[in-house]
Amino acid sequence: MSNIALIFGISGQDGAYLAQLLLSKGYEVHGTSRDAEMAEFSSLKRLGIKNKISFHSVALNDFRSTLKVLEEVVPKEVYNLAGQSSVGLSFEQPIETLESIANATINILEAIRFISCNCKFYNASSSECFGDTGENPANEDT
């Protein structure tokens, strides 16, 4: 059985580089977008890997949409890189930010539980959650 990865938020820089790494390790890679048919996936094109990935349209704020893609893909690994990534915009649009990050993560976790997916889950966050750590890098003691 091959390693299958599902990347929520594949169209961003981190998603593209993660997809490239997983492909180099022999993974079958699936990625999501709100509208996979219309999305440009410019980062994936630039890396020359867009045609090696299977794309799925998913509305992460909709549980059924999230559940459907997990049932179709049956991944061994799930990566959540989706959501609002601009700190400034997160303060301007707090409700949308909450929905795009917290509710989406809950939907992914609940869908994994619902289908009894025996998979690894990785949830990306922002270094902004640590605040100002001074001149030192953030670590477990910060």
Language-model features: where?
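N-terminal Rossmann-like NAD(P)+-binding domain of SDR-like oxidoreductases, especially those catalyzing
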Residues: 1-142
